[in-house]
């Protein structure tokens, strides 16, 4: 065994980057790692910032996959769509794990910098709102917090003006089963998707004959899987907030834990959950 330190360059690894793109160059790490600006001298504020910044990065990827999945469905590329939906589920699994890190912050730790946050709040995350809009939970009232950023407001408004991903799924369902979409209920673009018996009847037909309708069955289960992880993320959000601030009002003026608990009752794909009791 040699006593000298291993030199990867001797095995052909490139060690100098004055003339080439490095890892840091490709990822723009100089800019990325310079975006954590604490407003206080509290030690745990850095954790709080990085927790939310990394969550936003994962949500950016989730949106990238969801938009591509919607396009793939419209083009009949179901295999590609399934891969994208599976990835979104894994993204929310990753986001769920991140709460474990934030839970190491105690209420006493949080109070040391909470005032520095002002009225900023996670419920103002436009990417989270866009994910909900894409999946079908559409509340036009939630546009208001983004009026001060015209391009963001326009992005969210544009999503509200088009069918959600679940609307496209149901269009595919009716087209496959009926051969047309004449009986497909018109989607409400400006309201959360509500349970519809006509849609549920079609899904029951799928679940009653999965061999014939395997692609639709697999699609439905991919959506249930996605919402399962999404619900867990919401639940972990509630328990983390309750653990850290109790039942105080949120920094954004919401009722805090009570507001988050209300969100737990929201179902993105209600027909796919309700039909389970009818099988």
UniProtKB/Swiss-Prot annotation:
For this UniProt record, the keywords arranged alphabetically read as follows: Dioxygenase, Heme, Iron, Metal-binding, Oxidoreductase, Tryptophan catabolism
Catalytic reactions of this protein? L-tryptophan + O2 = N-formyl-L-kynurenine
Signal peptide range in chain numbering:
none
- Binding residues annotated for substrate, in chain numbering: 48-52, 110, 114, 251
Give the note describing cofactor binding and stoichiometry: Binds 1 heme group per subunit.
State the EC number(s).
Answer: 1.13.11.11
- The top EC class is oxidoreductase
One GO biological process this protein is involved in is: L-tryptophan catabolic process to acetyl-CoA
What family does the database annotate? Belongs to the tryptophan 2,3-dioxygenase family.
Q: What is this protein called?
A: Tryptophan 2,3-dioxygenase
Q: Gene name, please?
A: kynA
